[in-house]
A protein has these predicted regions:
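Conserved, well-structured ligand/cofactor-binding cores
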Residues: 1-462
Length: 462
């Protein structure tokens, strides 16, 4: 492999001649060759957005020559578009500040900008990775800003639209099923009736509240650390640089980012992301309940609850012919477990803000973006390939309703709790109908029984 010589503050490093990265990236490839997971492309794009925004501000302030600024912007745009995606090989498991990744982006943009200006890669002339691309910046404010940009863009553009899709479908099902009366279950035992629509309205409300929590916690993500540089003081920036670069970032992303009023907390801690992850955790908890209920209610087809008919997307067994499984429910529940686990990792990582810098940034970024990505994808699939096609099994629902002993609850106000309990126990012991045992006691007539024990009337206050 042909090499070229690059240098940094430590010395000379041989870099593959066809690559845009430089010495810092090559060192990281050697010293942090841990695992297979590379830094999320969204972080790379977000850092490039910061670089182009800084170059624009510096050009306006006449702190960088126009041709250099223009070349940086053009190179940054290529990074953002994914054109240079093979130039970012670094693993998540690196320095806790993300310095190697920031320098990876600096070097790639620098060398590509040099190329645009007809220079020679690796010379750092006329575009220097630190003096020009990283001007007025530190990894310590760039990486947390990139984290917030990534979280905001991925949530707004992917996660929330997919959650909204599921919300709409659950609401639609709650209306579609509003006249279907079924037996309720508490403690996995028979309980009083409700409508299938009421049951689905509970799922709808859970998801609606989850979306609201995510939207509320997203507000703090819109505050950016950029302009704080090394420890939050803004050293090596001109006054109001934070406001100007944030304005450029907002303009490009079409998201109303704002400069964090206190840069120290945004660099030393990641409470906003820990809190945001908590809202994803709550959403995962809700989705776990919803998807489990749906797959349990769809169990069978003959030896389970069988109250829901789930879409048949693919064969379910390599040995049992004709078997179909609730695979979408299984996939989304596995994602929920991962999101809950990611939140634990983020919470622990959030505690490691030692003095002026949290040093678990790459882990936090990896976990939160993975959670957003997995939730977004799984919810979309769950919506389109499961919830949308759910149908009620009316015969099975009626069978369970008619056989339930808990309909006796409606008699309690008329004949008393103790008498109602005795009737239910006798019906169970004798394998007889509730109505038969109730009339046999002489406490109530058949006419009264039929009037009181009316499942549809039991789905609301009397």
């Amino acid at each position: 492999m042909k090499k070229r010589k690059e240098f940094d503050s430590i010395g000379v490093v041989n870099v593959p001649a066809d690559k845009y990265w430089g010495a810092s990236t090559e060192r990281s490839n050697k010293f942090f060759n841990i695992g297979k997971v590379i830094v999320n492309p969204s972080i790379i794009r977000s850092i490039a957005i910061i670089k182009r925004s800084a170059a624009i501000v510096h050009k306006k302030e006449r702190l960088i020559a126009g041709k250099i600024s223009n070349a940086i912007v053009k190179a940054s745009n290529e990074v953002i578009s994914g054109k240079l995606e093979n130039s970012f090989p670094l693993k998540v498991w690196q320095t806790g500040s993300g310095t190697q990744t920031n320098m990876n982006v600096n070097e790639v943009i620098s060398n590509r900008a040099i190329e645009i200006l007809k220079g020679k890669k690796g010379t750092k002339k006329p575009v220097h990775p630190n003096d020009h691309v990283n001007k007025s910046q530190s990894t310590n404010d760039v990486f947390p800003t990139a984290m917030h940009i990534s979280v905001a863009t991925e949530t707004i553009n992917k996660l929330l639209p997919n959650l909204k899709l599921l919300e709409i479908l659950l609401k639609k099902k709650s209306i579609e099923f509003k006249k279907i009366v079924k037996i309720g279950r508490t403690h996995l035992q028979d309980a009083t009736p409700l409508t299938l629509g009421q049951e689905f309205s509970g799922y709808y409300e859970q998801l609606k509240k989850s979306i609201e929590r995510i939207q509320f916690s997203l507000k703090d993500i819109l505050f950016l650390a950029q302009g704080g540089t090394a420890v939050g003081t803004g050293l090596n920036t001109k006054k109001n640089f934070d406001k100007k670069i944030t304005r450029e970032i907002s303009k490009y992303c079409k998201i109303p980012f704002r400069p964090a009023p206190n840069k120290f907390s945004e660099i030393a801690a990641h409470d906003a992301i820990v809190n945001f992850s908590g809202s994803l955790n709550s959403c995962a908890v809700a989705l776990m309940k919803i998807s489990n209920d749906i797959r349990f209610l769809g169990s069978g087809p003959r030896a389970g609850y069988g109250e829901l008919i789930l879409p048949e997307n693919e064969p379910g067994s390599s040995i049992m012919p004709g078997k179909v499984n609730p695979t979408q429910c299984e996939a989304v529940t596995m994602v929920c477990v991962k999101v809950i686990g990611n939140h634990t990792g983020i919470s622990i990582a959030g505690t490691h803000g030692h003095f002026e810098l949290n040093v678990f940034k790459p882990l936090i970024a990896h976990n939160i973006l993975q959670s957003i990505d997995l939730l977004g994808d799984s919810v979309k699939n769950f919506s389109l390939y499961c919830v949308k096609g759910i149908k009620p099994n009316k015969l099975k629902i009626k069978e369970h309703l008619d056989n339930s002993l808990m309909l006796v609850t409606a008699l309690a106000p008329r004949i008393g709790y103790d008498n109602a309990a005795k009737i239910a126990k006798k019906a169970l012991a004798n394998n007889t109908k509730l109505k038969y045992e109730a009339i046999k006691t002489g406490l109530i007539s058949e006419k009264e029984y039929d009037k009181i024990v009316n499942p549809i009337k039991m789905t609301g206050p009397y």
